[in-house]
Amino acid sequence: MCGNNMSTPLPAIVPAARKATAAVIFLHGLGDTGHGWAEAFAGIRSSHIKYICPHAPVRPVTLNMNMAMPSWFDIIGLSPDSQEDESGIKQAAENIKALIDQEVKNGIPSNRIILGGFSQGGALSLYTALTTQQKLAGVTALSCWLPLRASFPQGPIGGANRDISILQCHGDCDPLVPLMFGSLTVEKLKTLVNPANVTFKTYEGMMHSSCQQEMMDVKQFIDKLLPPID
């Protein structure tokens, strides 16, 4: 994604309709690509925001009998006590931090960037935001969990993002990443960052997917945190 994996294509991008003064970087779920999410953001875009939907590298995934598929890091199991791919998660987070740095070089300050993702991508967006020294505007974490949660402190994190705004969304009928994981994650997040800035929304009948109401909530969150500045 950042020169370390030549087989990963360039991100799907929804360019700003005028000069970009803010950006959303959104990470897809396991086995997917950024294209579908770029289409979704094209439907809720604001003219001063650039939407960047990178594609994960293709790699074998333990959970899926070692079949190769787009994956930000290896997934060994989907229960809260499953072993985790610590080195893969940390390397993936470094790649996302490099992507943020690239946008800063392009003239968008990091505090005008929202990081987000769905499922595995949402997990990576949370982990990256909580471990980076880049001050971000917020995180939109959809149908996901916090990876390596035991590696975080018992109390608030230090660093740039202890007051970050987080919108976490989950379907109440999710069979893959159960709602309970979302609830446990939001409770943990409230101990790590200012709990007043953490919002948890659930969607009745929604499975491991998205819905129109959720995208409207995501748009409202983005537009509130990244207003036009000109």
Curated annotation (Swiss-Prot):
Matching Gene3D superfamilies: alpha/beta hydrolase
N6-acetyllysine sites (modified residues): K224
UniProt signal peptide: none
Active-site residues, Swiss-Prot/TrEMBL: S119, D174, H208
InterPro entries associated with the record: AB_hydrolase_fold (IPR029058), LYPA1-2/EST-like (IPR050565), PLipase/COase/thioEstase (IPR003140)
One GO-annotated biological process of the protein: fatty acid metabolic process
Primary site of residence: cytoplasm
Catalytic reaction equation(s): S-hexadecanoyl-L-cysteinyl-[protein] + H2O = L-cysteinyl-[protein] + hexadecanoate + H(+); 1-hexadecanoyl-sn-glycero-3-phosphocholine + H2O = sn-glycerol 3-phosphocholine + hexadecanoate + H(+); a 1-(9Z-octadecenoyl)-2-acyl-sn-glycero-3-phosphocholine + H2O = a 2-acyl-sn-glycero-3-phosphocholine + (9Z)-octadecenoate + H(+)
Record-stated family: Belongs to the AB hydrolase superfamily. AB hydrolase 2 family.
Function: Acts as an acyl-protein thioesterase. Hydrolyzes fatty acids from S-acylated cysteine residues in proteins such as trimeric G alpha proteins or HRAS. Acts as a palmitoyl thioesterase that catalyzes depalmitoylation of proteins, such as ADRB2, KCNMA1 and SQSTM1. Acts as a negative regulator of autophagy by mediating palmitoylation of SQSTM1, decreasing affinity between SQSTM1 and ATG8 proteins and recruitment of ubiquitinated cargo proteins to autophagosomes. Acts as a lysophospholipase and hydrolyzes lysophosphatidylcholine (lyso-PC).
Identification of the protein by name: Acyl-protein thioesterase 1
The organism of origin for this protein: Pongo abelii
Gene this protein is translated from: LYPLA1
